[in-house]
UniProtKB/Swiss-Prot annotation:
It comes from Proteus mirabilis (strain HI4320). A divalent metal cation binds at residues 246-247, 270. The keyword Phosphoprotein does not apply. It is an enzyme of class 1 (oxidoreductase). Transmembrane segments: none annotated. Signal peptide: none annotated. Divalent metal cations. Prefers magnesium or manganese. One of its GO terms (biological process) is malate metabolic process. NAD(+) binds at residues 157, 270, 418. Homotetramer. This is NAD-dependent malic enzyme. HAMAP family: NAD_malic_enz (MF_01619). Pfam families: malic, Malic_M.
């Protein structure tokens, strides 16, 4: 017997009148039926016409088009989200490719910078250091009781924009919007959180409208103890939640992940999500070329936690294809602002020290100084893949790309830094410098490039291809942890969905219009791997399929029936 989806059953609610209209998760606006208007004391509070959600979407989209500035469009969409969440997600679903860059990167970066200026209405939790004694009470104050996914930031490394203080809240809000729009996770189950530990950004500290704690960032033991107080409070309030760390500074991101990954179900999207989507793209590119990843040589510009996280995932895949750990690491070249990471560089972080090149292997290289530049790496190591996670614009110069193309007929070039203003090279330039031969994937959205009358689609190596599917898979399987194997399976599942890998042509990654189907597929593979790893509580395949469909939320209005508190 086919089970009735939850969305088809009536929802019993105690709210009525203006209070109901002020509740974004429940508000239908003009779509309340005549019966509901009578039952919930709404007559006179709404215009006479009873509309369908399709009619509401049409009006909202017309209003959206009236805004010419992307930031204004972002503010408008956020206002709908804070008024009527079902309408917001139906509108987003109807225009996903067009609106994703507005609700998330690159537009969300500007929204974070101006968060205190454009603030309209509270969403999520602002947990400040001065109120640290009340964290349990703050979590109890959340308007959502059955939270299944939390995205938390401390606002210190927002995209490529640095310290934005509580302005970083725009990132958890945007990320969770994509969990719902792309992964079908009900907005009733999501909670954005910002840990307000101060800010070192003088613009924020000196801004009379800044809404956060006006204090330099706390560090060291104070910081670690505060984060731990938050984590322990979350475990008490929602012990089975999936917690995603987002946009923490390099000095904190990896230590926090390592500290808590075996304590609760958590992952860091900047490290693990970026690595997973990048690896999926590289597996797809290798398949399209009839090769394996173990045959490639990879150079990185940017050796922070994100870059090193990607490198470790690539190494794991190379090892699964037959290389030893030593052989795989010999194919990875990490360059940061001090040059190539080698055993001669002092003060390397632990995760960087695992990715150094030994000096004796570089003895024959032609270099000008001990600080080996990216250009010198390209000339000597002859990489077939170039990945940028530096957060600095224009560092993939014409000389570097042309030098790479000399020894690699079809180089893969991935300038992943975002927002768009921080990209290492623009796709149009890369295509031109390689005579149309480069395979390009970027971190921010770019329009297709036309070169010599041929159109080149530019894949956006966007984490939204990965994390919504991981989230849905974790929730459906009841996974207690996010393991490395689950992330690896997510990468391979994404590669399975690549039009280029399957057909030899077309874009490297699926169209954003297909992202819901991609997320469902990734969720299924992740959930199955959770079973294999022994971290799932749903153990049968049939129950797993049912759980994925049951947990996949659609933006449709439910029939309301009244109940009392």
């Amino acid at each position: 017997m086919e089970l009735e989806h939850e969305s088809k059953r009536p929802l019993y609610i105690p709210y009525a009148g203006p209070i109901l209209l002020e509740f974004p998760l429940l508000n239908k606006g003009s779509a309340f039926s005549e019966e509901e208007r009578s039952t919930f004391n709404l007559h006179g509070l709404l215009p006479e016409a009873v509309e369908t959600i399709e009619e509401q979407v049409e009006r909202a989209y017309r209003q959206y088009l009236d805004f010419k500035n992307d930031n204004d469009k972002h503010i408008y969409l956020r206002n709908i989200q804070d008024t009527n969440e079902t309408l917001f997600y139906r509108l987003l679903e109807s225009h996903l490719t067009e609106m994703m860059p507005i609700i998330y990167t690159p537009t969300v970066g500007e929204a974070c910078e101006h968060f205190s200026d454009i603030y309209r209405r509270a969403r999520g939790l602002f947990i400040s250091y001065p109120n640290r004694a009340n964290i349990d009470d703050m979590l109890q104050n959340a308007t959502k009781q059955n939270v299944k996914v939390i995205v938390v930031t401390d606002g210190e490394r927002i995209l490529g924009l640095g310290d934005q203080g509580i302005g970083g809240m725009g990132i958890p809000i945007g990320k969770l919007s994509l969990y719902t729009a792309c992964g079908g996770i009900s907005p009733a189950y999501t909670l954005p959180v910002v840990l307000d530990v101060g800010t070192n950004n003088p613009q924020r500290l000196n801004d009379p409208l800044y809404m956060g704690w006006r204090h330099p960032r706390i560090t060291g033991d104070e910081y670690n103890e505060f984060v731990d107080e938050f984590i322990q409070a979350v475990k008490r309030r929602w012990p089975n939640v999936l917690l995603q760390f987002e946009d923490f500074a390099q000095k904190n991101a990896m230590p926090l992940l390592n500290r808590y990954r075996d304590e609760l179900c958590c992952f860091n999207d900047d490290i693990q999500g970026t690595a997973a989507v990048t690896l999926g793209s590289l597996i797809a590119a290798s398949r399209a070329a009839g090769r394996q990843l173990k045959d490639q040589t990879v150079a990185f510009l940017g050796a922070g936690s994100a870059g090193c996280g990607i490198a470790e995932q690539i190494i794991a895949q190379m090892k699964s294809e037959g290389l030893s750990d030593e052989q795989a690491r010999a194919r990875i070249f990490m360059v940061d602002r001090f040059g190539l990471l080698t055993d001669k560089l002092p003060n390397l972080l632990d995760f960087q020290s695992k990715l150094i090149q030994k000096s004796e292997t570089l003895a024959d290289w032609q270099t000008e100084t001990d600080a080996i530049s990216l250009l010198e790496v390209v000339k000597n190591a002859k990489p077939t893949i170039l990945i940028g996670v530096s957060g600095q614009a224009g560092l993939f110069t014409e000389e570097i790309i042309r030098e790479m193309h000399k020894h690699c007929e079809r180089p893969t070039v991935m300038p992943l830094s975002n927002p768009t203003s921080r990209v290492e090279a623009r796709p149009e330039d890369i295509i031109n410098w390689t005579d149309g031969q480069a395979l390009v994937a970027t971190g921010s959205p770019f329009a297709p490039v036309t070169y010599k009358e041929k159109v080149y689609p530019i894949a956006q190596c966007n984490n939204s291809y990965i994390f919504p599917g991981i989230g849905l898979g974790v929730i459906a399987s009841g996974a207690k942890r996010v393991t490395d194997a689950m992330l690896m399976v997510a990468s391979r599942a994404l590669a399975d969905c690549s039009p280029m890998a399957k057909e030899g042509d077309g874009p490297l990654l699926p169209l954003l219009a297909d992202i819901q189907q991609v997320s469902r597929y990734i969720a299924k593979q992740v959930a199955k791997e959770a079973q294999v790893q022994g971290v799932a509580t749903v153990t049968s395949d049939s129950a797993l399929e049912e759980a994925i469909e049951r947990n996949y939320w659609e933006p449709e209005y439910r029939i309301y029936k009244r109940t009392s508190f």
